[in-house]
Amino acid sequence: MRLTRRVFSHSLLGTGLAGVLGPPALAQSGPAEGVHYVRLAEPAPAGPPGKIEVIEFFWYECPHCHAFEPALEAWAKRQPDDVAFRRVPVWFREEPFSAQQRLFYALEALELLPTLHRKVFFAIHNERTRLRTAEDLSAFALKNGVDPLKFVAAYNSFTVQSKSLQARQIAAAYKIDAVPAMGVHGRYYTNGTLANAGAERGSNDRMLGVVDALIAKVRQGNRA
């Protein structure tokens, strides 16, 4: 239940496991390393000091990312203070990824992600709106009540360009080749295929159970 770099390059469509379920339980023994998640050979940057960082890697045009968003958002709201959650838009090649990466960080700079992040998904997947060029994105901003001059200034800003580059670097550190995927504290990585190993039916929501177990694992290690 993911969109891979290979699948994107052939068809721009995800091919995944069937069915989106409620958050399914893992086996009683919990997720297994090398089966439901992998440990990074070289740790990635771990985020804010004193926090357990969790990253979702996504792409706005990925239908599985769109379907995953409600469960992910609800999960994020339940996290305690020691968990720092953030999203990272991926880049597999220049177009159409660059423009949508910069869109995300422009909305972040304008403090509009809480209101417009889900609307970007809705525009692409429900309204079939093309959001692949600066002109497309400016029109989207205007339609949603954003001053187009402020949007363009943010979109072209050094801050947004720098964050887009950093996003590519962190995705490379986690060796991301499919979305949606999740990284935990610079140490662990899982995606829909891994999280659903051995399951009769697949759901990206199962990633959240794996991530919960990995957060507990990091937390226990920090206390040791």
PLM region spans:
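Extracytoplasmic thiol/disulfide redox context detector
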Residues: 2-95, 213, 219-224
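Sec-exported extracytoplasmic/periplasmic mature domains
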Residues: 67, 77-80, 108-112, 121, ...
